Amino acid sequence: MKFDKLIELLKEMVTTIEAEENQTLLEKLNREELINTMQFLQRCAAQAGYYYNLQAPGSEFGTMKLQTAENDDPIVAQVKIWDNKEHKIRTRFSLRRLVTEEDGSLSVKLPCGSYEAEVTCGPEYSTVLVPFEITKDKVTTIKARLARIAHLTDHGWTAGDLHHHSIYSSPAYGGTDPVIETPDQVCRSMKSLGMQFGALSDHHNVLNHEEWQRQNNNFTPIISKEISTSNGHVLQLGVDDDVIYEIPKGKERTTDKLRNEFIRICSEIRKKGGLPQVNHPFDVSFSTRYNSEFWDMVEIFESMEIGNGTTPFAAGTINAKAFKKWLSLLDEGKRLTATTGSDTHNIYGDDYFGMTEWLDWMMDIVMKHPEIYPVQMNEKVAYLTWLYNKVWPRLLSWVEQSNTPSTIHNYVYTNGKNQPQEILQAIREGHSFISNGPLVTAEVDGISYGVKAVLKDRTGTP
């Protein structure tokens, strides 16, 4: 079991609870001690004859076939499948996230048993729950009819995701991330959650641009790239060229050099008609969070990602810090449009699922069979158990509901003019809002998002 990613997920939720309750939870076990304790307990369990096996040998399978539609028209939809209602209620995590084909069809092979499918197409559609049974070597056919419950498109709004990765970020194309999805799969994933536009922002290259621009069936593809700088990530939106931040090394790595490279690439993006954005400015890694010495020049960017889909939008997280900073920038008169991006590296959202099930299994063994580990571990195990019981239900709730692509939407007002440059211009001007579900548009005396309103006192004086 690879523990690093699991620990990072635990720490995200721990940080949130610490911020909410103003207490420290990891004072007795730091990151390394957590990993060492889990590895030790896993070996103790194995020595006692307990081995983790996600899928029992000889499992029998059947097939589920689904057809989704809006009225009588096929629709691309997201499908979440739980193995049964009891697991969902107990938060014992067992979830598959799938995406239908363009014609609304889905066929998937599943172990025999009882299931429930949750089918939706984003916040403007109803959610349909369909229970079904899988029988050995049989095909179970189900249907889901989705109803449109909101019509923001009719009022000039369009929804999209500005931060997503594909196979072009992987080692196959010179990248470092284990992403396997093609641009076509990414587009269907975005559409399954109600997106009408999207930016495919791979690392290190612009190789996806030609293929991404072909994804134009009821969808507006925006070309982009996420630029690595070694002290932050910059999103170039709407530029076809490969803008590169020249990372200085050795004695040449000075604050002035780093600062000037930020200025240069943002200027280049703007000159080429693009929009420069700072991504996840408070990320946990030094190489991916924005250099804290450079906030004085943040206006070289035109937008700022305050909601990153890899972490909850909750107190204490990188998103909460970015949101707070964005508000303080507004107070200083520095106006950047707030955006969100899923930062998806896996459209199926199953990065943690084997890990979460493994941790459930291990903690179940440890709590039921304390005899498997030496008494010298009692204090650490007791603390780990307390941490697990306090943090795990909250964390699983986030993974189940929110750890999927495009959870938070960018809604941009274009008045029906949905070409890439028109969408980017609307973002520049702040004609947008972000939401993870509630759809609220607001006007003050006929003025909506992004328009400067002059407040007057009772005498009519500004």
Give residue spans per PLM region.
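Short, flexible loop/turn segments at beta-strand junctions in immunoglobulin-like
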Residues: 108-110
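A metal-dependent hydrolase metal-coordination microenvironment
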Residues: 127, 150-279, 285-287, 292, ...
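Short amphipathic alpha-helical heptad-repeat segments
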Residues: 6-13
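Charged, low-complexity interaction regions
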Residues: 18-31
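C-terminal functional module detector
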Residues: 10, 41-63, 67-85, 89-105, ...
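Sec-exported extracytoplasmic/periplasmic mature domains
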Residues: 191-195, 331, 428
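Acidic, His- and aromatic-enriched active-site or binding-groove loops in soluble protein domains
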Residues: 222, 226, 301-310, 362-371, ...
